[in-house]
Amino acid sequence: MNLSLFGAGKIVLSILFVFSLTACFPTSQHPIEGNPMVNLDDTFSGIWKGELSDGPVTILFIQQSQDDTGTFHIGGLLVRHHEERPSLNEGWLEFEGEVVVIRDETFLSAQLNQMGGAPVAAEEKGYYLFRLVLEENSMRVLGLNNLVTAELVNRGALEGTVNRAQTTASIRLTSNGAALREFLNTANLAELFSSSFAQLARRQ
């Protein structure tokens, strides 16, 4: 196999993954503000394996730190595997994020830095907002529901734009981090974060 074509194929698959993320989940101009996590231990470290909605995935957490404001930062790689042949990698994404706690719930604001070794274009930058359901060795990652978020933007509960030029509406939230925190303090989280992104288990 031509290695250059193989590498290009991985980049194309990574790009398609970014497009599918944008189509399935709203993005935010700002990360969520909230309280810092406590007892971090090694929650966001090591190797986690699991399933996306369309195939197997491995997430490698390679960086975690806390800044002077108490905000917890993480970074890592997401590697997609072939659905029928998990030993084959279909591409990878480098991401970073901020983790906060609101109402004893854990939230991740994640943005992509690289896909398949190429920097993410400026127009594709943005935070994907997730609710994390954490157990000792498992993690469920829930994304914003597109329809619910669009309705919230349309009635002014959240600031943002809804672009219906595509088959699936593309949503961009513009509320700042404090406004997002205030909204999440009273929101129906089960309804808002009802789109499953990944189910992961820590590799022992």
Question: Language-model features: where?
Answer:
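Bacterial N-terminal signal peptides that target proteins for export
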Residues: 2-12
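Generic hydrophobic-segment detector
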Residues: 13-14, 94
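C-terminal motif of bacterial Sec signal peptides marking the signal peptidase cleavage site
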Residues: 20-23
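Calycin-type beta-barrel ligand-binding domains and close structural analogs
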Residues: 25-43, 51-57, 64-204
